[in-house]
Amino acid sequence: MIERRPFAGLGGANHGWLKAKHHFSFAGYYDPERMGWGNLRVWNDDEIAPKAGFPPHPHADMEIITYVRDGAITHKDSMGNTGRTEAGDVQVMSAGSGVRHSEYNQEDETTRIFQIWIQPATRGGSPSWGAKPFPKAERSGRFVTLASGFAGDDALPIRANARVMGATIKAGERVTLSLDPKRHAYLVPATGIVDVGSIRIEARDGAAITDLSTVQIAGIEDAEVVLVDAA
């Protein structure tokens, strides 16, 4: 099963400094049919104005992955971590028993991110944060694991039964991905257009995938795609 979730039909909010679209219920957007996909709870598509951002606020018991599409995001937290994550790179925060953090666009241009929340395998534990560059050339024509709850993956660690993956797919190129049909995959092109199986998925649309052992993704335009493989 592959279900297209068009960008135009997503929930969202415009706060002036923040233009947000929500693939799943979040804040003031509630849809009982879109409370998550497996243990994937949140996928927000955020545009953050220059010199603006999220002031310090708390989180607990959530794995929070930030994929930077354009610009850069600067993170500070109550553990003493500070980091600037640029376009194409990824940061992960395991909120654990509780943490406060802020995220600001300190650049002179709009920053665009995907923020993905995944429910952890166990509650509590010490919070942690990390970031890692993932050059787009290294994921050309194939999926690379960006964050993972599985030992042995060369990726940022998360405490969840899930993987976050990324690929760049050129127009005319096809990539085949093996899946567990009992799990839940969710794919979003950051840019470009792809066919997921026979379903056309445009930039910032979502594709909810389950009950399939393989899926073929074909580039219609050059595309940058992010996928979560969730329990």
Where are these regions (language model features)?
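Jelly-roll (double-stranded beta-helix
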Residues: M1-A231
